Amino acid sequence: MIQANNISKSYNNELVIEKFNIDINKKDFISITGESGKGKTTILNMLGLLEPPDSGEVIVEGKVNLNRKETMMVQRKKFGYLFQNYALIENETVEANLNIALIYRKGVNKKSLMKEALHFVNLNNSFLGKKIYQLSGGEQQRVAIARLFLKEADYIFADEPTGNLDMKNRDIVFGLIQKLNEMGKAVVYVTHDIELAERANQWIKL
């Protein structure tokens, strides 16, 4: 479980988030919506330990006030992230990008696992040799999801993961995110798309 207790955040002396509270359990599917500037991404970043709150606390599976080393360990082992801009290395191959999720996994057939991940996102094995910049936006986000599949994270934080996609690819990508949730992973996602927000089992409106 992840617990946020009265977390607050200010930028340039302007309060953006005040005393926000939430409990996130495994298998939760939580959406966050709100107007620009309401702090949606700020909340996501604090929950995902990408930035600390100014006050309050984020408790990760019973541990509070994690130091830098502990935070990095949690991010590596338990957390996964999806971003609107895909966060892939554009001049590297799909294989190289997927391998990032397998760096710490020893004694496994990495190529076989990569093929399994591509199958999960409905891309064929020929994509392993393609450069990221050769792919469409929808294909890039599917590669990012394949990397999450390989990482085996318990909690996924997604910031506008379908924001740059057309309707067809939006539905494909969001369907894959739902499949990750069905595998037992908690998903917290920011979206401007009300239709997608309504598919959550908990909808936070800022």
Language-model regions: role of each:
Residues 109-126:
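Conserved ABC ATPase "signature" region
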Residues 145:
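Hydrophobic anchor residue at the start of the ABC signature
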Residues 156-159:
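Catalytic Walker B motif of ABC-type/P-loop ATPase nucleotide-binding domains
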